[in-house]
Design a protein with these regions (language model features):
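Membrane-embedded alpha-helical segments of transport systems
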Residues: 58-63, 89-91, 110-130, 148-153
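Generic transmembrane alpha-helix signature in multi-pass membrane proteins
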Residues: 67-74, 82-87, 94-107, 111-114, ...
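The feature identifies polytopic integral membrane transport proteins across all domains of life
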Residues: 49-56, 77-89, 106-115, 140-143, ...
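Membrane-interface helix termini and inter-helical loops of multi-pass transporters
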Residues: 11-17, 43, 71-77, 130-143, ...
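Single conserved hydrophobic/aromatic residue that forms the stacking wall/gate
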Residues: 2-13
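Hydrophobic transmembrane alpha-helices of secondary-active transporters
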Residues: 22-46, 64, 154-163, 179-203
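Entry/N-cap segments of selected transmembrane alpha helices
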Residues: 41-71, 81-82, 119, 147, ...
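Juxtamembrane helix-boundary/capping and inter-helix hinge elements in multi-pass membrane proteins
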Residues: 40, 47-51, 74-79, 100-109, ...
Length: 220
């Protein structure tokens, strides 16, 4: 859905003027996530360590393997394969928490797993991506590590610190965070998609099918 929405919005951004700011926008989203985190979000690590470990293993073992299987099964080209594998090697993000809530699942456990996998991402994702994707594209794990640290980890830590120091003020503005995050994410996807509109138009169906299968199998 994001791809279809952004494909239409891409006409507004024909010059892709947002592309230079994609990293900043991602940082804004991660900072917003950090503002919503507190020590209690990690409490399930101590209360139910086995379940948390299973969730982390599922995220960083099963999801990449599922992505790799789908890439091979559909015979995707190198660039599409790299994109699908990157999705499989990245943490679930807040969307997994939303799905847990809508499905009446264990939201506290989901939040804890999401928080842990996001923090582990700088260490785990580059190595995983190199392992599965180096046969398709050139991968620099060190550069990827620092990129994730700067764009993901540092903004999250900054958000956690601000929340700890100015919690009262944060509570007043946190209600606006979902809207800000949605705007930032749509802007990011729109900028990236509009820059490769022709290529995406050619492969939209297969991308949608593979990503949908990856998500559905993963949520099982």
């Amino acid at each position: 859905r994001d791809c279809l929405l952004s494909r239409g919005l891409g006409d507004v951004y024909k010059r892709q003027f947002l592309l230079p700011y994609v990293s900043i926008l991602l940082g804004v989203v991660m900072f917003g996530m950090g503002l919503t985190l507190s020590p209690k979000d990690f409490s399930e690590v101590f209360h139910r360590p086995i379940q948390v470990i299973i969730g982390i293993v599922g995220q960083f073992v099963l999801m990449p393997l599922i992505a790799f299987f789908l890439v091979k099964a559909f015979g995707l080209s190198a660039d599409l394969a790299a994109g699908v594998l990157l999705v499989g090697c990245c943490p679930g993000g807040t969307s997994s928490n939303v799905m847990s809530y809508l499905g009446k699942g264990d939201v506290p456990l989901s939040v804890t797993i999401t928080s842990c996998t996001t923090i582990l991402a700088p260490l785990v994702t580059p190595g995983l991506f190199w392992l599965f994707a180096h046969q398709y594209i050139e991968v620099d794990p060190a550069a990827m590590f620092w990129s994730i640290v700067k764009i993901v980890l540092l903004p999250i830590i900054g958000g956690v610190v601000v929340n700890a120091l100015f919690g009262t003020v944060v509570k007043k503005v946190v209600v606006a965070l979902p809207l800000i995050s949605v705007f930032a994410i749509i802007s990011i996807v729109t900028a990236v998609v509009s820059a490769s509109a022709e290529r995406i138009a050619e492969t939209a169906l297969i991308i949608f099918l593979v990503v949908a299968l990856h998500n559905c199998i993963g949520y099982l």
